[in-house]
């Protein structure tokens, strides 16, 4: 058996049918750069990574090139066995044990680093790391060469990879296009409702009535209330469903309070279950793979529907935040069916409330190409817009601020990124809208405070949303500094200072007012 296509029936048998990775055309053996050779070595069929305590700035990798030039509408699946000792957990993104793929997205020029879930700290015995990466209709950029990566990123510990266990294949899409022709119908009040425009509120129960009053004065009429914070809490301690239930109750109490403030001002709320049992909807979570967590997710929405039934300020129930399912789930627990189950549970209690349904790939526009419409009325479909990510997220989420002269601008003529390119990226969403008579809600979009041209990017995004008739909420209001439109960077100190006289703030407030 070779390591190219396996028939779909083989998938039921699982990874045991993976063929060993052979030398690929245009590929090479595992290589170790000179800069990390003192931490990484190969002994027979073992890759040893040993980074001593106190060393935390090293990417101790072995890499292997792979030709992905003809990989379209398919998936890469890979696995390897690994064991470790004294691994130190670093809570910052992307640190830790690595089985990953490094490649460049040819659509936007962004570098991608998808990685397998892996033990985060301490000692662990032989563990099977599994990586799955989906590719769309456009081939991966050929340069720089895509690389498979094994190792330890920016933390210390000792790892042993069994290279003889490394398996790899090119597989069919996890979610082949299975669209239907269902035409969504909406109640008269929803169909005739004016445009809803607003922001994602503060996380971790930190919204205030003054926040809502200020948003009302700015012209907003919608707030996405994120019930979040549990994923970061889980990283700090071993968590249980009891912990999650207590967290949910605190968030629902806060949501009731915020909803009252909104209703008093004739504004509405998107209720967003940002953290499911017990963590996230992608690499950081198990809701698709642990039956108890999946069932609790559905039950939680049943409880929420009972609690908020009849509240006039509910715009809709936002079932999932940014599902990123890349491997097979339990039966009826994949991102689509789990949302279906939750929607059915809600409708059994409240037949009138609006459901907000999430696309895969972190609500990405591309995922609308294979998203099937739920055969249920009064469902709004949600997209998030952060393309190109190399522009929107430069300096965000703990990443260092780009050095002067290295920032990515918008528009970006060198990469062909402008308003029409944004339209191209959003095309699958617009096509889904037309095909199903579906309402679309942009739950998140943004550009970092450090991004040159961020204000123009927001204006162009909002212009497209308005053209298509989509409701939207900006990410986010008075939360992380890199998204806060009420601040600017003091170039003398490099620190944020309050100042509303900036392009991002004006773009957003003009958008609220339909300008």
Task: Place the predicted regions along the sequence by residue.
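Bacterial N-terminal signal peptides
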Residues: 8-20
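Extracellular and organelle-lumenal recognition/adhesion modules and their flexible linkers in secreted
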Residues: 21-183
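N-terminal carbohydrate-binding accessory modules
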Residues: 171-245, 432
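Aromatic-rich peripheral "rim/lid" segments of glycoside hydrolase catalytic domains that contact
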Residues: 176-179, 452-515
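Acidic-and-aromatic substrate-binding clefts and catalytic sites of carbohydrate-active enzymes
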Residues: 201-210, 230-233, 246-249, 295, ...
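Aromatic-lined substrate-binding rim segments of carbohydrate-active enzymes
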Residues: 210-278, 338-350, 457-465
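Surface-exposed, active-site-proximal loop segments in enzymatic domains
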Residues: 231-251, 277-293, 325-327, 484-492
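Active-site region of glycoside hydrolase catalytic domains
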Residues: 295-416, 423-447, 467-470
